[in-house]
């Protein structure tokens, strides 16, 4: 028998939908239910590799972990990975099907709904409850036609909806009441309740506000959720959550990450963010690399050539040269590794017009962007120090050259990855997720002279998910949400 389902939509982006689903997934799992997280459509350049070689959004990876379920591409059947202001790579059930501009993607949506529904019903066949996360705002009625992410999906499956508002931004009453006002009557009829997230202060002071929202909308009040400070200990998927400057570092080694416009997979630096022994900073374009930085990291990119141009336009290429002269280290990961080489060639036009561009020339390697995309979990050891690692590959392109003969990493199957130059001052590789490995992270920080905290990152994430579940059990009517969930049915047709 198919699982019951309930959907969580928001009054806007970044109101806490992803963490709400993760926390409820853990809470219901601890109650003994088999939970499946599901997001019909996600837009993110932070992705995770599934066991079958596909990819899903990082938020769904965290939600799967919260539910203690293996990741599957069906948890996020449509993933959009922005490559420009108007276009994205389109991933369907874990596989890239091409690139599309926003206008062209709108025309694709009716065809994509079939994949969305197939994935949803697969999950529902093997769970007690499916927790569905919407995308962006439920009130974007200009996008309602052909919608597969919010009310379009809810209507197709007749899934009840809970709307989440964020009081920390201010105006939460207007946001929730306004959402009800702009929804079409048949969409509004699917909304069963609301939650107010990120409250600070005495909840009694907002009791009248909760009552006012309920009275004006007719929706059930399901909880006023205090701010959960430990949320920072969980991976953040959206660039909205990307931190800026860190606090003054004192004597701590300073590690800077160049946050170019299309940065991807930046969640892999979350373990470093939790280490008190370093001062981690994400530098926005226009911010120079500090003179006292110990390491400058060039992270992954969804549009390597465009971000390399942006790097040069902001003057970071000059800063990197000065940084190296001062004895600082440079690490490139994935797209950042490609930038460190002498040349990046794109003969088939994966990132725009076919052609090639000069790299930074800090590693004697060249990259050719190819059709094949590497998507796999890997393990092995640092080539020089033989420190074990685990991580994942997620890239297009092949990189080779004289410097690659001194690889940064050696895989357990004998393959190698990356390159090292200037006795380790400059290094690059394709593998993401290295800093989640406690042993490798401690080794890397030790070489910087940082005092390590003994952080057990994976255990910390597990404990934080348990804490989030307990937080929601205290402040949310979880049993009420369970009671609202119902088994999916096709939308009734008019006689």
From Swiss-Prot:
Catalytic residue positions: 334 (nucleophile), 432
Pathway participation: Cofactor biosynthesis; adenosylcobalamin biosynthesis
Keywords: Cobalamin biosynthesis, Glutamine amidotransferase
Coiled-coil parts of chain: none
Record-linked PROSITE patterns: GATASE_COBBQ (PS51274)
Pfam families hit by this protein: CbiA, GATase_3
Residue ranges of every copy of the GATase cobBQ-type domain listed in the record: 252-440
Biological process annotations from GO: cobalamin biosynthetic process
Annotated S-S bridges: none
SUPFAM superfamilies on file: Class I glutamine amidotransferase-like (SSF52317), P-loop containing nucleoside triphosphate hydrolases (SSF52540)
One MF term in the entry's GO annotations: catalytic activity
Biological function: Catalyzes amidations at positions B, D, E, and G on adenosylcobyrinic A,C-diamide. NH(2) groups are provided by glutamine, and one molecule of ATP is hydrogenolyzed for each amidation.
Family: Belongs to the CobB/CobQ family. CobQ subfamily.
Protein name (record): Cobyric acid synthase
Organism encoding this protein: Bradyrhizobium sp. (strain ORS 278)
Lineage of the species this protein comes from: Bacteria, Pseudomonadati, Pseudomonadota, Alphaproteobacteria, Hyphomicrobiales
């Amino acid at each position: 028998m198919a699982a019951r389902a309930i959907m969580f939509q928001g009054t806007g982006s970044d109101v806490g939908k992803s963490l709400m689903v993760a926390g409820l997934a853990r809470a219901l799992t601890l109650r003994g239910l088999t939970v499946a997280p599901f997001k019909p459509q996600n837009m993110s350049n932070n992705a995770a590799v599934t066991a079958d070689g596909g990819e899903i959004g990082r938020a769904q990876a965290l939600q799967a972990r919260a539910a203690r379920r293996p990741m599957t591409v069906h948890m996020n059947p449509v993933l959009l990975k922005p490559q420009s202001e108007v276009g994205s790579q389109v991933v369907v059930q874990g596989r890239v099907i091409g690139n599309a501009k926003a206008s062209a993607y709108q025309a694709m949506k009716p065809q994509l709904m079939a994949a969305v529904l197939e994935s949803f019903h697969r999950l529902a066949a093997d769970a007690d409850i499916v927790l569905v996360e919407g995308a962006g705002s439920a009130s974007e009625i200009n996008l309602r036609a052909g919608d597969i992410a919010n009310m379009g999906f809810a209507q197709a499956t007749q899934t009840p909806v809970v709307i989440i508002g964020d009081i920390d931004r201010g105006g939460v009453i207007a946001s929730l009441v306004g959402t009800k006002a702009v929804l079409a009557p048949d969409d509004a009829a699917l909304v069963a309740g609301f939650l107010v997230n990120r409250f600070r202060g005495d909840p009694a002071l907002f009791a009248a506000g909760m009552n006012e929202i309920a009275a004006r909308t007719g929706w059930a009040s399901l909880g006023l959720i205090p701010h959960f400070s430990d949320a920072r200990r969980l991976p953040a998927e959206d660039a909205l959550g990307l931190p800026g400057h860190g606090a003054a570092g004192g004597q701590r080694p300073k590690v800077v990450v160049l946050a170019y416009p299309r940065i991807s997979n930046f969640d892999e630096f979350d373990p470093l963010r939790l280490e008190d022994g370093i001062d981690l900073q994400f530098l926005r374009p226009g911010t120079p690399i500090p003179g006292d930085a110990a390491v400058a990291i060039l992270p992954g990119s969804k549009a390597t050539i465009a971000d390399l141009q942006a790097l040069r336009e902001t003057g970071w290429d000059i800063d990197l040269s000065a940084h190296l002269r001062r004895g600082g280290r440079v690490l490139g990961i994935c797209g950042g590794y490609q930038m460190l080489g002498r040349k990046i060639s794109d003969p088939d036009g994966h990132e725009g017009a076919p052609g090639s561009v000069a790299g930074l020339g800090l590693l004697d390697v060249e990259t050719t962007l190819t059709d094949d995309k590497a998507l796999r979990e890997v393990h092995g050891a640092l080539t020089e120090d033989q420190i074990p690692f685990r991580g994942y590959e997620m890239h297009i392109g092949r990189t080779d050259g004289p410097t690659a003969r001194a690889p940064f990493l050696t895989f357990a199957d004998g393959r190698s990855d990356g390159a090292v130059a200037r006795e380790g001052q400059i290094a690059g590789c394709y593998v993401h997720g290295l800093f989640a490995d406690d042993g490798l992270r401690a080794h890397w920080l030790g070489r910087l002279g940082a005092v390590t905290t003994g952080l057990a990152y994976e255990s910390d994430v597990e404990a934080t998910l348990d804490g989030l579940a307990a937080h929601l059990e205290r402040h949310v009517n979880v049993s009420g949400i369970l009671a609202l969930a119902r088994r999916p049915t096709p939308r009734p047709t008019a006689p």
